[in-house]
């Protein structure tokens, strides 16, 4: 069985003092298409593979070529993936819940380097031998994640740095908890990073959450992000503040809103200020298919 899914988005993006000779405000867009193939045995074991095609404004034509494939097998709550895998740190719940705007961005995200699913074709060839293994297990509201990434599997392991990650999350109708830990994140020696998050849904319309990050070797140090959202009918208002343990850094913050036109179609906007007091803003439309 073959299926297609993805999304398109387009709108205005503003970055204060983007660069010498560069416009601060541009039209920003993306088209993402996932090609997913699955089959199931008589015993109920599912085998699957995924390829992604993605174009962002500014990409060369090669940017729309398929990325590296991901393969998986799943049975009774256990999924084992190989290839271009979703890593534990990038997959755990809550870590991206402060994001806002049609581009889904936030200064409240982790400021560290770590491996994640590679969405695009790598024209440089740097990822030709990148490979990983990931295992997930789900039961009774608990999700467990384990991942391993070798950035170049053809080179002796003593000459490259491999990333190992573990994570878990749990949720009921009101409370969500999550945690993750990764060693040598992003293939950087001794770049050990961590995350702990909690969220409380105080009614059907509103949620508040608190995330803590140890950003490893990043100059950001420890980071705390407080965020919340509240829905008024078809409109959802979002806000966050984030602080890092770096001398002279400003407190980052953002406020945004979504309006749901229909299922899978929304207009979103945000205004955010970063750790260097830089201002970014966006407004645009996203539609899922």
UniProtKB/Swiss-Prot annotation:
Highest rank taxon of the organism: Bacteria
Mind listing the GO molecular function terms for this protein?
Answer: porin activity
> How is this protein situated with respect to the membrane?
Multi-pass membrane protein
Pfam families the record matches: Porin_4
Could you tell me the keywords of this UniProt record?
Cell outer membrane, Ion transport, Membrane, Porin, Transmembrane, Transmembrane beta strand, Transport
- Give the UniProt entry's GO cellular component terms: cell outer membrane; pore complex
Gene3D superfamilies the record matches:
Porin
Q: Where in the cell is it found?
A: Cell outer membrane
Identify the InterPro entries for this entry: Gram_neg_porin_domain, Porin_dom_sf
What's an example GO BP annotation here?
A: monoatomic ion transport
**Principal cellular location given in the protein's record:** membrane
**Role noted for this protein:** Forms channels that allow the passive diffusion of small hydrophilic solutes up to an exclusion limit of about 0.6 kDa.
> How does this polypeptide assemble, per the annotation?
Homotrimer.
**Name this polypeptide is given:** Porin
The scientific name of the source species is Fuscovulum blasticum (Rhodobacter blasticus)
**Record lineage:** Bacteria, Pseudomonadati, Pseudomonadota, Alphaproteobacteria, Rhodobacterales
Name of the gene encoding the protein in the UniProt record: opmA
